[in-house]
From Swiss-Prot:
UniProt name for this protein: Uncharacterized oxidoreductase C26F1.07
Gene Ontology, cellular component aspect: cytosol; nucleus
Family, similarity comment: Belongs to the aldo/keto reductase family.
Gene3D superfamilies: NADP-dependent oxidoreductase domain
Species for this entry: Schizosaccharomyces pombe (strain 972 / ATCC 24843) (Fission yeast)
Enzyme Commission number(s): 1.-.-.-
GO terms (BP aspect): arabinose catabolic process; cellular detoxification; D-xylose catabolic process
A GO molecular-function descriptor: aldose reductase (NADPH) activity
Active site location: Y60 (proton donor)
Pfam families: Aldo_ket_red (PF00248)
Length: 321
């Protein structure tokens, strides 16, 4: 067996066990900012190649294409872990089940494996994804996240959602949920990469039995993230370790492997067939590798949530680029 085949099989086989015993694939496909008319083929390609986790969200505006890609892949639904997220315009408790129904309709699915509150930010309830007043200012609405969470818990009773969780919550907002939760969040999705490891926060989740999924694992590779610092996957430390592992190992491989080695699942995004396939590799990194990566001194959070009316990342490891 070649080294590349071994890395591929590692990626296929790696799973993490959630608190209820369910197993979430360690490596999935993100669909944020996947271009129109390309998302379907990206999802189809990923699933046919070996991915078994597809990460979607209402705000991405492409759940219909995600659903088409799942259907056309030929991979049985029971073998795929599908995640979606509740957008900020549906935090009112009565809006939560309606938002789920819209997502399921678009995805052409009967249930989700995982449904997350996308952000602890509440906009005016309605169809408009970013509701604004006549002056162009975003319109916010008071919907306590505790009440939104209770509405999420009720979704579990319908069988249309199997796990519920959070995305982009800081410690304060996480604690607010934990105080009222009858069902503890199964998963918390957050920006994580070697420039933003958030080690203490990740460790807290492990102790709580809440699985963590890393998004934007390549950091500032996405063109939406303007940055004055070098590309993460081109950093000399990342490249040095990649070269030491042999042919076919890239900076992206190391970034993905770093995430998985530290116990988090990871959802790199691409619509490029070659990159979708090349991203699907996992090399268990040594302690020396991990220590070297963790010693990188750069700290940068690229998703700054400029639409929020609150400092949603207050108290967390941060970085301004």
């Amino acid at each position: 067996m070649s080294a590349e085949q071994k890395y591929f099989e590692n990626a296929q086989n790696v799973h993490f066990t959630l608190a209820d015993g369910s197993k979430i694939p360690g490596l999935g496909l993100g669909t944020w900012r996947s271009e129109p008319n390309q998302t379907k083929n990206a999802v189809k390609t990923a699933l046919q190649y070996g991915y078994r986790h597809i990460d979607a969200a209402a705000i991405y505006g492409n759940e219909d294409e995600v659903g088409d890609g799942i259907k056309e892949s030929g991979v049985p639904r029971k073998d795929i872990w599908v995640t979606s997220k509740l957008w900020c315009n549906a935090h009112a408790p009565e809006a939560v089940p309606k938002a789920l129904e819209k997502t399921l309709k678009d995805l052409k699915l009967d249930y989700l494996d995982e449904y997350l509150i996308h952000w602890p930010v509440s906009f005016k309830t309605g169809e408009d994804k970013f509701p604004k007043d006549k002056d162009g200012n975003l319109i916010y609405e008071k919907n306590p996240i505790e009440e939104t969470w209770k509405a999420m818990e009720k979704l579990l009773e319908t069988g249309k959602v199997r796990h519920i969780g959070l995305s982009n919550f800081n410690d304060t907002n996480l604690e607010r949920i934990l105080k009222v939760a009858k069902v503890k969040p199964a998963v918390h999705q957050m920006e994580l990469h070697p420039f933003l490891p958030q080690t203490e926060f990740v460790e807290k989740h492990k102790k709580l039995g809440i699985h963590v999924t890393a998004y934007s694992p390549f950091g500032n590779q996405n063109t939406i993230y303007e940055s004055k610092i070098p590309k993460l996957i081109e950093h000399e430390t990342i490249q040095k370790i990649a070269k030491s592992k042999g042919e076919g190992v890239t900076g992206a491989t190391i970034a993905v492997s770093w995430a998985i080695t530290r116990g988090t699942s990871v959802i790199p995004k691409s619509v490029n067939e070659q990159r979708i396939k090349s991203n699907f590799k996992y090399i268990p990194l040594t302690k020396e590798d991990m220590d070297e990566i963790n010693s990188i001194g750069i700290r940068a959070r690229f998703n700054q949530a400029t639409f929020s009316n609150e400092p949603v990342f207050a108290g967390l490891e941060d970085g301004r680029t």
